[in-house]
Regions:
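N-terminal "arm"/small-domain region of PLP-dependent enzymes with the aminotransferase-like
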Residues: 1-67
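Conserved PLP-enzyme active-site core in the AAT-like
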Residues: 5-16, 20, 40-43, 64, ...
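Short, glycine-/Ser/Thr-/acidic-enriched flexible segments
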Residues: 33, 173, 228-229, 244-246, ...
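Conserved N-terminal alpha-helix of the aminotransferase class I/II PLP-enzyme fold
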Residues: 49-94
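Short glycine-rich or small-residue beta-strand-to-loop segments that form or flank ligand, phosphate
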Residues: 59, 86-88, 166-169, 327, ...
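Structural signal for conserved beta-strand scaffold positions within catalytic alpha/beta enzyme cores
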Residues: 87, 133-135, 224, 354, ...
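Conserved C-terminal alpha-helix-loop-beta "cap" of PLP-dependent enzymes
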Residues: 294-469
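Charge-dense polyanion-binding interfaces
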Residues: 466-486
Length: 486
């Protein structure tokens, strides 16, 4: 086998060679290097459209890689400290779902926090696994769910020793980290696999100034969003696995749902970004840390806002904090996060990652500059001056843990009927309701609808949150499980 090193980018290099050749395309895609769609060329550029190609012998095949894609995956595994890696072109949604489908079958139990991304619960709908939700602590001031607590996980393991796996969000969207190494050791001692949704942690492995990464903590699988903080194109992702997993079986699971027409634009972007991180990741992310800490200090100096950080660490529900996450509590100026989000975009042409009931998140990454930070800080100061109010009518909590009545799969495939939000109180939900982003369900199939949850949904609607998941696009009605007593 030829020797590989991190200076190489096999897919990128193959694409460069392809561009130099004068191959006449009688294969798909039908735009034929852009000639059949000049408007697309005008939008994306000739160089981009010219390498939007399908699988061919010189370019390998993602479903069964034997050459350049295999080499690219080996380089990813080496760069991230994994036993094996997979290039994923269905976003980290596909990576998360592959983790669960690889470890759980119908009727199997999986231990996880309730504040998971919808992709995890969707995987439960697909495979029929039974969720064992861990109760989450909520920060009383900023209203966000915190990390998994070791004692609560230990109790769940003791109560459900037959569970197959534990899923951990690390870090959360807000930057909260659990005791990943301790939880991994605890789960392994009980014979359970450890799956980590590391969508927001592609950068963790590359500097010791950040929390421990999933692979470094000994996890069995990790879903990594390279496009979020690693520099690759949107929808590209990585799935990392440890030595305990069978890579051939995992590949079979991936191929159940993965496109057979994989995008070489996405794969090349993963290849290039991996090389960049392997060669310059430490330097790049330490610069990101400096920018984030500077922004945090400047925002807190405005007054009213609270850009939180490592002071949240209590070694119980918060064991570390990803300081690259610029999470800011906004209710101190009387505005919800979504209101600040909308003002930044509509009045200041600044697009942040998301706003929710109490917080905003500005994603700081390898592409940011000091002048961008200054513009954000200035806009936040201006918003406080022009738009702040008393905020007496705001809802404090960001997270409500629902009661699970039916498994997600049973509920999703049950006969349903549509009720108004108020009529649905007390019923069992038959669909998802969530603010997106971040895509964490307020309600999932199989959960009891309460007055508190309905009030939260109505408040989120009033304040401009983008609600998704329901058949009713206006979210005035919700599908509930149809039963005789209903």
């Amino acid at each position: 086998m030829k020797e590989l090193d991190q200076n190489q980018a096999p897919i990128y290099e193959a694409m460069v060679k392809l561009r130099k050749k004068r191959i006449v395309p009688f294969d798909v895609p039908g735009h034929k290097r852009g000639r059949g769609n000049p408007e697309l060329v005008e939008l994306l550029g000739e160089k981009c459209v010219g390498i939007d190609v399908n699988s061919m012998k010189p370019l390998d095949n993602l479903g069964h890689p034997i050459s350049i894609i295999r080499d690219a995956e080996e380089l990813v595994a080496d760069a991230f400290g994994a036993s094996h890696a997979f290039l994923m072109i269905g976003g980290t949604t596909s990576s998360v779902q592959t983790m669960i489908l690889s470890t759980c079958k119908a009727g199997d139990k999986i231990i996880l926090p309730r504040n998971v991304h919808k992709s995890a619960i969707n995987a439960l709908v697909l495979c029929g696994a039974i969720p064992i939700y861990i109760e989450m602590s909520v920060d009383p001031k900023i209203g966000i769910a915190l990390g998994l607590e070791n004692d609560r996980v230990a109790k769940a393991i003791k109560k459900h020793p037959d569970a197959k796996a534990i899923l951990i969000n690390n870090p959360t969207y807000y930057g909260i980290c659990s005791d990943l190494k301790g939880l991994t050791e605890m789960a392994h001692e009980a014979g359970m696999m450890v799956l980590v949704d590391e969508a927001h942690g592609a950068h963790l492995h590359f500097t010791d100034k950040l929390p421990i990464s999933a692979m470094d903590a000994g996890a069995d699988m990790a879903a990594v969003s390279m496009h979020k903080s690693g520099g690759s194109l949107t929808q590209s992702s990585l799935l990392l696995i440890g030595k305990q997993m069978n890579p051939e079986y995992v590949r079979q699971i991936i191929n159940l749902t993965q496109s057979t027409s994989a995008s070489y634009l996405l794969m090349a972007s993963l290849d290039i970004s991996r090389r960049n991180l392997a060669l310059r990741g430490k330097e790049s992310f330490e610069k990101v840390i400096e920018l984030s800490e500077y922004a945090r200090r400047e925002i807190n100096a405005i007054g009213g806002y609270y850009a939180y950080s490592k002071e949240l660490i209590d070694s119980v529900s918060v064991c570390d904090f990803d300081v690259t996450k610029l999470s800011v509590y906004t209710q101190g100026i009387g505005l919800t996060g979504i209101e600040v989000y909308d003002l930044l975009r509509d009045e200041y042409d600044i697009q942040i990652e998301f706003g929710d009931i109490g917080n905003i998140l500005a994603y700081i990454s390898i592409g940011d500059r000091i002048q961008d930070i200054e513009r954000l800080v200035g806009a936040l100061a201006d918003i406080k001056r022009l738009y702040s109010r008393d905020g007496k009518d705001l809802i404090a909590g960001e997270y409500i843990q629902p009661e699970l009545v039916l498994s997600p799969q049973e509920a999703f495939y049950s006969e349903r009927k549509s009720l108004t939000l108020d009529e649905s109180i007390g019923q069992v939900c038959g669909e998802f309701v969530m603010c997106y982003p971040p895509g964490i369900p307020i309600l999932a199939p199989g959960e009891r609808i309460t007055r508190e949850i309905v009030d939260y949904i109505q408040f989120a609607k009033e304040r401009g949150c983008s609600l998704q998941g329901t058949e009713d696009p206006e979210v005035n009605h919700i599908n509930v499980i149809k039963r005789k007593e209903n």
